[in-house]
Amino acid sequence: MAVDRQLANVRSGVCYVGLVYKRQPKADDSRHACCAAQMFLSDGEGVVFRGALGPWYQPDSKQFHLDRSAAQQLASTVLGEYRLRHPDDPNPAELFIHAKSSFSDDEWGGFVDACQGKGTNVVGVQIADA
Protein backbone atom coordinates (compact mmCIF):
# COMPACT_ATOMS: atom_id res chain seq x y z
CA MET A 1 0.00 0.00 0.00
CA ALA A 2 1.45 3.36 -1.03
CA VAL A 3 1.52 6.08 1.58
CA ASP A 4 0.73 9.62 0.47
CA ARG A 5 3.21 11.81 2.33
CA GLN A 6 1.89 15.03 0.84
CA LEU A 7 1.20 17.60 3.54
CA ALA A 8 -2.11 19.46 3.58
CA ASN A 9 -2.13 23.09 2.45
CA VAL A 10 1.57 23.11 1.57
CA ARG A 11 2.46 24.84 -1.67
CA SER A 12 4.72 23.25 -4.25
CA GLY A 13 7.95 25.17 -4.88
CA VAL A 14 8.01 26.55 -1.34
CA CYS A 15 10.78 25.64 1.07
CA TYR A 16 9.45 25.86 4.63
CA VAL A 17 11.97 26.40 7.43
CA GLY A 18 11.30 26.46 11.16
CA LEU A 19 13.93 27.96 13.45
CA VAL A 20 14.46 26.81 17.03
CA TYR A 21 17.05 27.77 19.61
CA LYS A 22 18.51 26.12 22.68
CA ARG A 23 20.39 28.14 25.24
CA GLN A 24 23.70 26.68 26.38
CA PRO A 25 23.53 26.96 30.20
CA LYS A 26 27.17 26.03 30.80
CA ALA A 27 28.54 28.67 28.42
CA ASP A 28 30.51 31.61 29.80
CA ASP A 29 28.16 34.01 28.01
CA SER A 30 24.49 33.71 29.09
CA ARG A 31 23.46 34.77 25.56
CA HIS A 32 25.13 31.69 24.05
CA ALA A 33 22.69 29.43 22.19
CA CYS A 34 22.54 26.90 19.37
CA CYS A 35 20.24 27.47 16.43
CA ALA A 36 18.65 24.60 14.53
CA ALA A 37 16.45 24.70 11.46
CA GLN A 38 14.01 22.15 10.16
CA MET A 39 13.35 22.30 6.44
CA PHE A 40 10.29 20.60 5.07
CA LEU A 41 8.91 20.36 1.57
CA SER A 42 5.54 19.70 -0.04
CA ASP A 43 6.37 16.00 -0.52
CA GLY A 44 6.64 15.53 3.24
CA GLU A 45 10.43 15.25 3.26
CA GLY A 46 12.22 17.02 6.07
CA VAL A 47 15.80 17.69 7.10
CA VAL A 48 17.14 19.15 10.34
CA PHE A 49 20.21 21.40 10.26
CA ARG A 50 22.30 22.48 13.18
CA GLY A 51 23.16 26.11 12.78
CA ALA A 52 25.92 28.08 14.40
CA LEU A 53 26.54 28.49 18.10
CA GLY A 54 26.67 32.09 19.14
CA PRO A 55 25.33 34.93 21.29
CA TRP A 56 21.84 34.62 19.81
CA TYR A 57 19.80 35.13 23.01
CA GLN A 58 18.87 38.75 23.71
CA PRO A 59 18.02 39.10 27.43
CA ASP A 60 16.33 42.50 27.00
CA SER A 61 13.72 41.14 24.55
CA LYS A 62 13.98 37.47 25.61
CA GLN A 63 14.24 36.57 21.94
CA PHE A 64 16.85 34.89 19.78
CA HIS A 65 18.43 36.56 16.74
CA LEU A 66 21.18 35.38 14.42
CA ASP A 67 23.69 37.89 13.11
CA ARG A 68 23.66 38.57 9.37
CA SER A 69 26.48 36.15 8.58
CA ALA A 70 24.97 33.23 10.53
CA ALA A 71 21.53 33.86 8.99
CA GLN A 72 23.02 33.91 5.49
CA GLN A 73 25.00 30.72 6.14
CA LEU A 74 21.97 28.89 7.54
CA ALA A 75 19.72 29.94 4.63
CA SER A 76 22.46 29.03 2.13
CA THR A 77 22.74 25.56 3.69
CA VAL A 78 18.97 25.08 3.46
CA LEU A 79 18.91 26.25 -0.18
CA GLY A 80 21.80 23.91 -1.00
CA GLU A 81 19.86 20.95 0.37
CA TYR A 82 16.78 22.07 -1.54
CA ARG A 83 18.82 22.04 -4.77
CA LEU A 84 20.02 18.49 -4.06
CA ARG A 85 16.44 17.33 -3.68
CA HIS A 86 15.11 19.29 -6.69
CA PRO A 87 17.68 19.06 -9.49
CA ASP A 88 15.08 19.95 -12.15
CA ASP A 89 13.95 23.10 -10.30
CA PRO A 90 16.95 24.02 -8.12
CA ASN A 91 15.67 27.21 -6.48
CA PRO A 92 12.44 27.47 -4.53
CA ALA A 93 9.97 30.17 -5.51
CA GLU A 94 9.71 31.02 -1.83
CA LEU A 95 11.70 30.52 1.34
CA PHE A 96 9.10 30.58 4.13
CA ILE A 97 10.79 31.02 7.52
CA HIS A 98 8.92 30.77 10.80
CA ALA A 99 10.14 31.22 14.37
CA LYS A 100 8.85 32.18 17.81
CA SER A 101 11.14 35.23 17.81
CA SER A 102 10.68 38.19 15.54
CA PHE A 103 13.37 38.76 12.89
CA SER A 104 15.91 41.54 13.38
CA ASP A 105 16.90 43.68 10.39
CA ASP A 106 20.41 42.18 10.46
CA GLU A 107 19.08 38.62 10.56
CA TRP A 108 16.52 39.29 7.82
CA GLY A 109 19.25 40.80 5.66
CA GLY A 110 21.22 37.55 5.93
CA PHE A 111 18.25 35.47 4.76
CA VAL A 112 17.68 37.84 1.83
CA ASP A 113 21.40 37.82 0.96
CA ALA A 114 21.33 34.01 0.67
CA CYS A 115 18.44 34.21 -1.82
CA GLN A 116 19.90 37.05 -3.90
CA GLY A 117 19.83 36.31 -7.63
CA LYS A 118 17.96 33.03 -7.23
CA GLY A 119 14.42 34.26 -7.90
CA THR A 120 13.43 33.19 -4.39
CA ASN A 121 11.04 35.37 -2.39
CA VAL A 122 11.70 35.38 1.37
CA VAL A 123 8.70 35.35 3.71
CA GLY A 124 8.90 35.35 7.50
CA VAL A 125 6.27 34.65 10.12
CA GLN A 126 6.55 35.01 13.88
CA ILE A 127 4.65 32.27 15.67
CA ALA A 128 2.84 33.68 18.68
CA ASP A 129 1.90 31.70 21.76
CA ALA A 130 -1.76 30.75 21.77
Where are the model-predicted features located?
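Long, contiguous domain-sized segments
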Residues: 1-130
